[in-house]
Amino acid sequence: MDRNSVTGLAIIAVIMIVWLQFMSPEKKPLLPSKTVKTETVVQSDVQVPAVSIPAADNFGVFASSSGGQEKLLKVENDLFRATLSSKGATLKSLVLKKHLDGNRLPFDLVSNGKNGALSLLFLTREGKKIDTRDLYFSNVTLDTLRTIKGKESYAVRYHLDVAPQQAIDIIFGFTGDSYKVDYDVKLTGFASELAGNEYQVQWDGGVPFSEKNRPDEAQSALASAYLGGSLVKLDASKEKQSYREEQSGEAQWVAVRNKYFVAALIPHGKSAGIYLDGKRETGNDFESYLAALKIAVPSTAGVVDDKFSLYLGPLDYNIVKAQKVGLEKIMDFGWDWLTRPFAEFIILPVFSWMNGFVSNYGLIIIIFAFLIKLVTYPLSMASTKSMKKMSALQPALKELQEKYKDNPAKLQSELGRIYKEAGVNPIGGCLPVVLQMPLLFAMFYVFRSSIELRQHSFLWAKDLSVPDSIFDFGFAIPMYGSHIAVFPILMAVTVYLQQKITPTTQSNEQMKVMMYMFPAMMLLFFNNMPAGLGLYYLMFNIFSVAQQFYINKTTTAADMPQVNLGLAPAGAQRKQKKGGAKK
C-alpha cells in the first residue's frame, strides 16, 4: 500500500468512528407540555364494571355518555389479535402474531392499554375539551370474538347518541391478511359545535419498546409526520423536557415508531395539519409520544364523513411502501442523497430477491458480499495491479527524488510522466475502499433498523441485527463497548492479512504502524455494529485476500513497468562532474 492509500484508509477509519459517536442529531426541546403517562395493560375480560358519571360541567352535552359499562371485542386475523373497547371506541391491544419481542414473547403494539391508543379530540364552543376515550359508545356489532382469514373482511361499528340529531359513529374495518385497518369517523350535527371548526384523530402513548437493549431502541423511537413533501420528526430523548411540534398543511400521514414497529394514521382526504408531542420520563428509557391529524370541518356541514387507514405493524420496507403514501420515509437509511439510494435500490431489493430462494440471511449476506466483490472486481483488480507496479517503481523513484531534491517542480513533472508511462495511479489503492463507503454506511442503516434481519441467527450470532456478543463485561470500555463480538475480531484479522500480502511503498516503520493501527481501528468501529454488517465485511475481506493471492501468484516480471527515468548511467555522471560540461 502506498502512502496515499494508507492516509486515505486512516482518514476513512477516523471518519467512521467519529460518525458512529455523533451520528444522532441534537434534539432541541420546546416549551413544557402536558406529560403523557403510559402503561401497558392488556384487557382480557369481556365486561368491565360500570363507573359513576362525572359532573356535567366537565363534559357539557356529553355528560350522559361519560359513564357506563365497558365491553370488549376481540378481532383476530392472520397477522394480529386486536382488542377493541366500547369505552372510547378505541383500540386497547394489538398483539402481533408473527413478531415477538426481544425476550421472544408476544409483542403488543399498544402501550396505552388502560385508556386505549386511538381517539378523537376536539373542543366544543362551550369550552369543553372532549376526548372520546372518556365516552361510552354502544357496539352495534354484538360479537365478542371474531376470527377472519385471508381476504375475509369484518367491520366493527360504535355509535354514540349525544342529543337529538347529534351522533358520533366510529367504524373499524379489518381484513384477514393485512396490517392495515380502516378507520371511519362520522359526525352528525356537530359542525356548528366544534370550536375552531376542526377535530383531531390521535394515537396516544407511542409504541412500546420491543428489544432488550432499551437505550439503543430509544435512539430509533420518535413521532413523525409527512406533509408538503417533507418529513417532520420529533425525538423526545432528554429527561424532564417536553417536546412539541405543530404544523398546518395537508399531511400524508402521522406516525409513532420504535426500532422495528410503527403505528401510522393515514387520511384518505385532506387534513388541516399535524400535532406531535413527546416526553421521556425520569429514569426511564421509554419515550411516550402522541401523533395527531387535524381535520377541518365546514361550519355548514350537517354530516361529516372522514375516512382514514391505520397501519399497525412491522417496519418491513416492502409492506410499508405498499401503503403508497410515502410511509417508507419514516425508515432511517441515512443521507437521502447518498446512502438511502443504496439501501432502497440495491441492498433491500437484492436481499428480497435472494430471500425468495435462500431462507438463511447469513447465507444471503455472504452471497451479497460475493456479488459486490464480483461487481467491483475490475476496479479492485486494476487498483491492486497499480499498487504492485508502484511497489516495483520505488527504487527508481527514490533515485529520481534524490536527483531533483532541490527542484520540486521538476520532480513533480517527472513523477507525473513516469506514472503515466507506467500506467499507475498513486491514489488508486484506496479508491475501491472509498467507493464502497456509501454502500457500507447504507448497510449499517439497513442492518440496524430493518426488520428483515431481526431475530435471524447465523452460526453463533443469535440476531444478525445486533452485535454477535459472546461475552459481556458488565461495564463499558471507551470506544470499544461493553461486550466482545466475534465477527469484528475475525474481520480485523483479515484486514491485517490483506495488508500483509498487499504490495506497499511505505518504509518498514510506516508499514509496522499501519499493519496494527488500521485493523485495531476497524475492530473498535465494528464491535458495536450489527452482526450482519461484520459478517459482510469479513466475507468481503476474505474474497479480497483470495484475489490478492491470485494476483501475487499470476503477476510476472514482464507485467512490471519499463519506464525511462531520464537518468544517466553512474559512470557517465562521474565523468561529467570531473570534466565539466562540453562546449
UniProtKB/Swiss-Prot annotation:
Entry's Gene Ontology cellular component terms: plasma membrane
Top-level division of the source organism's lineage: Bacteria
Stretches that traverse the bilayer: 5-25, 341-361, 362-382, 427-447, 473-493, 520-540
Keywords per UniProt: Cell inner membrane, Cell membrane, Chaperone, Membrane, Protein transport, Transmembrane, Transmembrane helix, Transport
UniProt subcellular location: Cell inner membrane
Gene Ontology terms describing biological process: protein insertion into membrane; protein transport
Record has Ribosomal protein as a keyword: no
The keyword Calcium appears for this protein: no
GO molecular function, one term: membrane insertase activity
Cysteine pairs bridged by disulfides in the record: none
Pfam family, one: YidC_periplas
Role summary: Required for the insertion and/or proper folding and/or complex formation of integral membrane proteins into the membrane. Involved in integration of membrane proteins that insert both dependently and independently of the Sec translocase complex, as well as at least some lipoproteins. Aids folding of multispanning membrane proteins.
Subunit composition and interactions: Interacts with the Sec translocase complex via SecD. Specifically interacts with transmembrane segments of nascent integral membrane proteins during membrane integration.
HAMAP family (UniProt xref): YidC_type1
Protein's recorded name: Membrane protein insertase YidC
Organism expressing this protein natively: Pelodictyon phaeoclathratiforme (strain DSM 5477 / BU-1)
Gene this protein is translated from: yidC
